Swiss-Prot record:
It is found in: Nucleus, Nucleolus. It comes from Rattus norvegicus. This is Probable U3 small nucleolar RNA-associated protein 11. Part of the small subunit (SSU) processome, first precursor of the small eukaryotic ribosomal subunit. During the assembly of the SSU processome in the nucleolus, many ribosome biogenesis factors, an RNA chaperone and ribosomal proteins associate with the nascent pre-rRNA and work in concert to generate RNA folding, modifications, rearrangements and cleavage as well as targeted degradation of pre-ribosomal RNA by the RNA exosome. Involved in nucleolar processing of pre-18S ribosomal RNA. The gene is Utp11. Pfam families: Utp11 (PF03998). Residues 1-21 are annotated as: Disordered. Belongs to the UTP11 family. It comes from the Eukaryota. One of its GO terms (biological process) is rRNA processing. The modification Phosphothreonine is found at T90. GO terms for cellular component: cytoplasm; extracellular space; nucleolus; small-subunit processome. PANTHER family: U3 SMALL NUCLEOLAR RNA-ASSOCIATED PROTEIN 11, U3 SMALL NUCLEOLAR RNA-ASSOCIATED PROTEIN 11-RELATED.
C-alpha cells in the first residue's frame, strides 16, 4: 500500500529542470552546475593538501640526511632519474673477453679465406681484379717488326680469343676437333649468368675477408693498449686500418 502511494505521489511531481545560462551570459559558456563545482572544488582541495604536505616536509627536512639511493639518482629537469650502472669487469676478464673476440673473428676470416680459395679454383680465376694480372712480353729486333706485329697470328689463335689467358685453343685445334659443351644461345647466356653470379659472390667474400682482417687488427690494438707501458700514437685509426702506436722498448730479463 505504501509503495503504491509513493508511486502515485511521484507521478504527480513536477519534472525537475536545470536552470540554463541566461542569454546575456552565453559568451561565458555553459552554466556551471553543482556536480561541476564539486569536481572543481575536490581537485583544488587535493592540490592544496599536496602543497601543504610538501611545505611541511621541506620545513622538517634535515640538511644532513643521507640516503644511499642519492648516489644512484640525479636530478634532470626537476625529475629524479636513476643513473645507469655499468657492469664492473676486471682488466683480466676484459682482456680474456677481447682475446675470445679476436679468436672468433680470426676463425671467421680463415673460413672466408678457404671459401675464396675454393671459388677461385672452381672459376680458374687467372685474370681477376683482386690478383695481379699476368703479362706476356714479346721481344723484337727492329721497330718495323713491332709495327707489323699481329698477336693473333703470332699465337696462332682466333682474334676473339686473344684477350683470354686461359682456354685459348689454336686455329688448327678448332679446325680438327668439335666444339664441346653448350652451343645454343640460351644455354650460353645461362652459363654466363651463373658464372657472373659466382664472380659477384667471390667479390663479396673477398671484401668480407678484408673487413674481418681490419676488425681483428683493431681489437688486437685495443687489447694491446691495456698494457701500462708508455706509448705514443704514430698514426690515427681509419676505416681500413687500425691505429698505430709506438711502445716504449723494455729490456726482457
Amino acid at each position: 500500500m505504501a509503495a503504491a502511494f509513493r508511486k502515485a505521489v511521484k507521478s504527480r511531481q513536477r519534472e525537475y529542470r536545470e536552470r540554463s545560462q541566461p542569454g546575456f551570459r552565453k559568451h561565458l559558456g555553459l552554466l556551471e552546475k553543482k556536480k561541476d563545482y564539486k569536481l572543481r572544488a575536490d581537485d583544488y582541495r587535493k592540490k592544496q593538501e599536496y602543497l601543504k604536505a610538501l611545505r611541511k616536509k621541506a620545513l622538517e627536512k634535515n640538511p644532513d640526511e643521507f640516503y644511499y639511493k642519492m648516489t644512484r639518482v640525479k636530478l634532470q629537469d626537476g625529475v629524479h632519474i636513476i643513473k645507469e650502472t655499468k657492469e664492473e669487469v676486471t682488466p683480466e676478464q676484459l682482456k680474456l673477453m677481447r682475446t675470445q673476440d679476436v679468436k672468433y673473428i680470426e676463425m671467421k676470416r680463415v673460413a672466408e679465406a678457404k671459401k675464396i680459395e675454393r671459388l677461385k679454383s672452381e672459376l680458374h680465376l687467372l685474370d681477376f681484379q683482386g690478383k695481379q694480372q699476368n703479362r706476356h712480353v714479346f721481344f723484337f729486333d727492329t721497330k718495323k717488326e713491332v709495327e707489323q706485329f699481329d698477336v693473333a697470328a703470332h699465337l696462332q689463335t682466333a682474334p676473339e680469343l686473344v684477350d683470354r689467358v686461359f682456354n685459348r685453343p689454336r686455329i688448327e685445334t678448332l679446325q680438327k676437333e668439335k666444339v664441346k659443351g653448350v652451343t645454343n644461345q640460351t644455354g650460353l647466356k645461362r652459363i654466363a649468368k651463373e658464372r657472373q653470379k659466382q664472380y659477384n659472390c667471390l667479390t663479396q667474400r673477398i671484401e668480407r675477408e678484408k673487413k674481418l682482417f681490419v676488425i681483428a687488427q683493431k681489437i688486437q690494438t685495443r687489447k694491446d693498449l691495456m698494457d701500462k707501458t708508455q706509448k705514443v700514437k704514430v698514426k690515427k685509426e681509419t676505416v681500413n686500418s687500425p691505429a698505430i702506436y709506438k711502445f716504449q722498448s723494455r729490456r726482457k730479463r
